[in-house]
């Protein structure tokens, strides 16, 4: 068809790249086609063209590719299907419509469109040898994956995630109780009537998926989620010396300064995910502009952009491959952008992520722990909400990068020229409470057993808004929750 010819000519005009491979294949299938099939399936997908020769010495793209055609296209296609359905590859992910014969100036070219394989069936490998027959693709072409890369794909294929594994010989003695109790206080704010508020720490952690009892093997202990979220720093480093967290602020540098603020392993905080998240999140959002906006008689300070930053940070944690060698969860603040980098590649194609595709978290138990205290949107809605929030500004478009060579994902939220603009009203907000927060504090002072529903009715805002305001009061150290859902009470600490 003419449209097919035009499409192929358009592809060739861009030159051979990460999504295109041309092979001569005059009368037989080249052996190298299977390496390309594996690499495309394990990377971004791509197009294989049989019957086209590339002259690498030719710098003019228009002259670089020569259409020579194949002699017996039907035979080659038959051989291709017979081979791909044998034990040459572990999975055939193609359908009939993915293989076509295209006529270009009287010559037959075979076009094979290889989609990116579903993350649940990766890696796609050759010759029944998963560690020697798995390939990926970069700008240089096909390359054999390292054992580390293969193991990462195998880990990613587990639908139930990886943070539920039992960490043998690690128990409640390895939990930083201050971190866990801070979390439980915030949990009470968001779930004041929840029955879990009445149980002991071990039972609470078990209910969250942070502690496991394996009855069949007679073993019990912390799960990866429990240790990484609430563990003592030393215990985490002993078990996961491959993983670290890093926050760097590169704003307003003076002279030879490398950074203006940093949070890394320095012995002054327990190096678990909950403390890292709790300490760094306010640093990332405190100077974002808060335009004056009213809801009824109350001022609204929680902007879509603040929500987007929380979502970006949450995503970086729940999608991080915590078991990867030299894994770094790195959060950066620059004068003109915010950067969130997590170890592990995207499970879905980029275009599906932008459309709101459901990419199951690598760490679903940690995801649930954060969601129970108000962090993380509904499945599939998080990234589109980030995009929508940034469209409301003139700061630039968010950029999501899948860095194959580094085995990491980076999300960049541009800030335009607003990073250094902190209005006077915002400065006042950090020193004193908002009017709504003052109303809530006064309600609690008048009745320390007031319920969330009663606050919602009196303040005349949604339950979600009340819970968000209570979270702010908790984070500022003004409010804590004591006791269970039946006999619990609010305590104003200052």
Can you describe what each PLM-predicted range is?
Residues 1-48, 52-111, 118-120, 230:
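Polybasic/polar functional segments that serve as interface/processing modules
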Residues 464:
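Key DNA-contact positions within bacterial/archaeal DNA-binding proteins
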Residues 117, 133-311, 316-325, 333, ...:
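Active-site helix-to-loop segments that bind/position phosphate- or nucleotide-bearing substrates
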